[in-house]
Amino acid sequence: MNMSVLTLQEYEFEKQFNENEAIQWMQENWKKSFLFSALYAAFIFGGRHLMNKRAKFELRKPLVLWSLTLAVFSIFGALRTGAYMVYILMTKGLKQSVCDQGFYNGPVSKFWAYAFVLSKAPELGDTIFIILRKQKLIFLHWYHHITVLLYSWYSYKDMVAGGGWFMTMNYGVHAVMYSYYALRAAGFRVSRKFAMFITLSQITQMLMGCVVNYLVFCWMQHDQCHSHFQNIFWSSLMYLSYLVLFCHFFFEAYIGKMRKTTKAE
């Protein structure tokens, strides 16, 4: 159901990318995401135990490099996938932007779709810095990392509808988020409002994820969207749980602290 005919300019590495091999590899290996998740969980609990009796590591320069690398990657990903999605919206409409599988195998976006799902494994490295620097590790952080890895690998192999929206939104939010982390790690003073904006962007992303899932479900009934009920169920459960957790985090981190500050004054 690839009805996308793009006139967007491709870079040479995007042209040379073999999406068929990538999709086949993911179909054969997507379950390895469970192994990565198990190793990640083991590292979290083992690492925190080992660090209990050790002094924290500074790791400022490695953290700047790490965050900056992910920021640049996310910025390019957001620009390229965003260009694709805007083109489809302008020329084909909303339904096509949600249901078109061309995001996985079409020009421009095919490379970035695969890069996105693969990046969810190395992004687990965010937690290494938190543990080694003995910072607070909240449930939302590691739950989000594990579930995004599992779901993105699980969905990419089937080229399910909605993926273009999910990936483009995530690229966009991460472009801002990792840029913020890089600035903070480099010692720049960044307004608290910037952090609030990022969390609000994440909440908006989760709301949009729920809306996209609803549209996929409705259009799937008329054989206009390629997906299956099991995928929509897990995706909806994931996005709803994120929505609740990010709203709770926003209230605790910003609204609650504002109220405490007001009372103290």
Swiss-Prot record:
Pathway membership, UniProt: Lipid metabolism; fatty acid biosynthesis
Enzyme class per UniProt: transferase
Positions in coiled-coil regions: none
GO cellular component, one term: endoplasmic reticulum membrane
Tissue: Ubiquitous.
Subcellular location(s) of the protein: Endoplasmic reticulum membrane
Disulfide bond sites: none
GO biological process, one term: long-chain fatty-acyl-CoA biosynthetic process
Reactions catalysed according to its record: a very-long-chain acyl-CoA + malonyl-CoA + H(+) = a very-long-chain 3-oxoacyl-CoA + CO2 + CoA; hexadecanoyl-CoA + malonyl-CoA + H(+) = 3-oxooctadecanoyl-CoA + CO2 + CoA; (9Z)-hexadecenoyl-CoA + malonyl-CoA + H(+) = 3-oxo-(11Z)-octadecenoyl-CoA + CO2 + CoA; dodecanoyl-CoA + malonyl-CoA + H(+) = 3-oxotetradecanoyl-CoA + CO2 + CoA
Topological type in the membrane: Multi-pass membrane protein
Classification via Pfam families: ELO
Keyword Cytoplasm belongs to the record: no
Residues with glycosylation annotation: N2
Modification note: N-Glycosylated.
Residue spans crossing the bilayer: 34-51, 70-90, 111-131, 136-156, 159-179, 197-217, 232-252
Regulation: The reaction is stimulated by the presence of HSD17B12, the enzyme catalyzing the second step of the elongation cycle.
Alphabetical UniProt keywords: Endoplasmic reticulum, Fatty acid biosynthesis, Fatty acid metabolism, Glycoprotein, Lipid biosynthesis, Lipid metabolism, Membrane, Transferase, Transmembrane, Transmembrane helix
EC numbers on record: 2.3.1.199
Gene Ontology terms, MF aspect: fatty acid elongase activity
Function: Catalyzes the first and rate-limiting reaction of the four reactions that constitute the long-chain fatty acids elongation cycle. This endoplasmic reticulum-bound enzymatic process allows the addition of 2 carbons to the chain of long- and very long-chain fatty acids (VLCFAs) per cycle. Condensing enzyme that elongates fatty acids with 12, 14 and 16 carbons with higher activity toward C16:0 acyl-CoAs. Catalyzes the synthesis of unsaturated C16 long chain fatty acids and, to a lesser extent, C18:0 and those with low desaturation degree.
Family to which the UniProt record says this protein belongs: Belongs to the ELO family. ELOVL6 subfamily.
Protein name, as recorded: Very long chain fatty acid elongase 6
Organism field: Homo sapiens
Lineage: Eukaryota, Metazoa, Chordata, Craniata, Vertebrata
Name of the coding gene: ELOVL6
